[in-house]
Amino acid sequence: MKQMNQITIYSPHEINVAEILKNTPRIPHKKGNPGRSNKPVIIDMVCAFDIESTYLPDIEQAFMYVWQFQFGEYTIMGRTWEEFLTFLQRIRDSIKKNERVIVYVHNLSYEFQFLRGIYKFTAPEVFCMDRRKIAKCEMYGAVEFRCSYIHSNMSLDQFCKKMKCQTRKLTGTFDYLKIRYPWTPLDDTEIAYCINDVLSLKEAITNEMQADGDNLETIPLTSTGYVRRKCKAAMHRKPAWYQYIHDQLPDYELYVALREAFRGGNTHANRFIVGRILENVHSIDRSSSYPDVLVNHQYPVRYFVNRGPSSMDRFLKNKNVHKRACLIRIAFHDIKLRNYFEGCPYLSKDKCRNTTGGLFDNGRILKADYLETTITDVDFDIIDRMYEFRDPVILDSWYSSYGDLPQEFTDVIKDMYRIKTALKGDPDNSILYEKTKAMINALYGMTAQNPLKLTFEFFDEDYHIKEIDPSEELMRNNKNAFLVYQWGCWVTAWARAELQAMIDLAGDGVHTVSQFAYCD
């Protein structure tokens, strides 16, 4: 036991684990929620875990020399993995089989690389968001580690600042290059660096839950979980929402076409001025672009009907006369920029297929003898203005009706934006401001989430891609959907169209350098 700055630091064997857990309340499951009945009962105690490691460059090997565990109000430090495993086993032996202690780790993916060397994980014990990206893992059927970095999408220092923690991650003079072993004595400064990480993380999670009215059972696992929860509740208030959404959900064939058409923002360096230093540059920030287009543009709101190959006349009639949302696979012959000095060519080489005779600028198409691509009607309008081409052929086509997104959904967006604007600069509501700002930023990610993202499992001491039948998996995921994937495709398309309109207003950026504008 060591006393330092009014904090008592215990070694693992000095803690009466059984007595602490016996006197800690359990979080009851919400009544009327049958889905929770089979889930573990959560111990109502916020815990945090962290390790410090040394890297030996000669053998390219890292090892842990100290670990720290914030066990509720108790701060624990240990020096060996044997101590750590024994401590976890004492937790296991002190609770029921259906109970769990929740422990937050900032960047669990790093600690997991050490944990996998001391514990044989099975596939059900590890939740991978990607290869080597661990959202949570479980040990001994008793302790669940959750990644607070994935939860907050912030560094620990940023997270603690935004949650107004009294304890902060220490920064400055700590020598991370010093070789330390489990038997190396640590001075008070080094110990302070170690324990502050778990003290501050525990405080940040606690402050956040208090601000949001959450507990360890209801707190979202990821940063996008907050906005998903809010929007899902809003959609459930829409009359016949389930039928409304499920009438629009794509089948596998349409999903593939939507994946082909989906792309993100339009970011590119003007080939004529890249590397030059410009003067008299004026910048324009298109604030909250994705929330803006979600509220102020229309989207496909009926099921897409596949019409197969189509003539250009039929496509243009559907687009311009009937004002339908269009998704097309199209081939262009002899396509090239109308303006040679165009600084941001729209067509991306990665989103085109079977391209021949192409001339490219850092992945963008300046011209090509032939190419195929999948686009929305919004994309087509941009391409038609920017490029000239011959004999376009529509290889496949889908059509839907345009309409506003559900008011229940857009009201949430407007309310969040209103709150963020009202609370900006208000020190008494800084946590709510930061949470609302983060939720606004997460709106796009929620709408554009790929329902068939690769799923990884960890077993046999390695990562494996989970084998699935994509069509069956899509049907399974569709059962729980409260948004439709095509909305995400159109969100980015409308945002690119708005950005392109600003670029067009700014000029070509070469002959009007004094009026050049960078649009973000």
Regions found by a protein language model. Name each.
Residues 55-59:
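Short N-terminal binding/cap micro-motifs at the start of the first secondary-structure element
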